[in-house]
Amino acid sequence: MEHERRGVTRYNFGAIAEVVDLDGRGEVVSLTRDFSYSGAFVKTTTPLPTGTRVRVRITHSGAEFAATGNVTGNVIPTGMGIVFTEIEASDRAILERWLGVQS
């Protein structure tokens, strides 16, 4: 099932997510709940603070996607939203493949 939030379609998407605080204050390894071209929601009971700059690595079906982003908000106790701010072209291609976009 897909749904729209903030003008971006979000897709239910369960994958392994590693979120690393770029200031070295912590790391979360968990699962994504939903995913879009602009961000993801990561399930965790210990979210990083809003505004934290992070490196996200998501693994699904043998492929790995990476991006830099910011924590946009916390939903205690379910997780944190992350907006992607930097995505390399090769990672963008993986994202498009996962979400079903034809190039």
Predicted regions and their residues:
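Short, conserved beta-turn/loop elements at beta-strand boundaries and strand-helix junctions
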Residues: 22-24, 37, 74-79
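Short, solvent-exposed secondary-structure boundary/capping segments
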Residues: 41-44, 77-86
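Short beta-strand-centered aromatic/proline hotspots
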Residues: 30, 67-72
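Short conserved beta-strand and strand-loop elements enriched in small hydrophobics
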Residues: 15-21, 51-64
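N-terminal helix initiation/capping motif
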Residues: 1-35, 96-103
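Short, charged/polar, Gly/Pro-enriched secondary-structure boundary elements
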Residues: 89-93
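Short, surface-exposed secondary-structure edge patches
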Residues: 8, 43-47
